[in-house]
Amino acid sequence: VPVFIFGHNAFAEGIGEQLAVIELPAAWYMVLVPPVQVSTAEIFASKELTRNTLPIKIPPFSVWQGHNDLEAVVCQRYPEVARCLEWLKRLEHTTIARMSGSGSCVFAEFATEAEAQVAFEQLPSNMKGFVAKGLHHHPLRDLMNE
């Protein structure tokens, strides 16, 4: 979401309202779309949601240190999301596998397109997804600079 609001890859603090530009390594992603719709309001209202997470600061932020507090609650309430995420975590060559935002999509990051495509070819027939290249900034920024 930050790239659409801010125009660049961004590190979000607070509840996502404090954005700072961050340089990330080039990456490819496999995104899985579980066959459920997660209610963001339901997840944020959940008593199981961790509300006292210590903030991560930049620097020395590492993408591997981050986490999504909503992920555990969504996976508990929506087994389809948990199944997709667990499948991604078992793949070779992933740097991370996480849930996107409040769900239901989950993703795995790969260093190369070839690694992402090999993983995608293993996708079970009962799962839906796609492969996408990570962007450093929103493509409309290029048009604005022409």
Please annotate each region the language model reported.
Residues V1:
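Glycine/small-residue-rich loop that forms an oxyanion/phosphate-binding "nest" at active or ligand-binding sites
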Residues F4-I96, A111-E146:
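Conserved, helical-rich catalytic subdomain that frames metal- and/or nucleotide-binding sites
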Residues T95-S104:
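Short glycine/threonine-rich catalytic loop with a Thr-x-Gly-x-Asp
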Residues F107-E109:
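Short hydrophobic/aromatic beta-strand micro-patches
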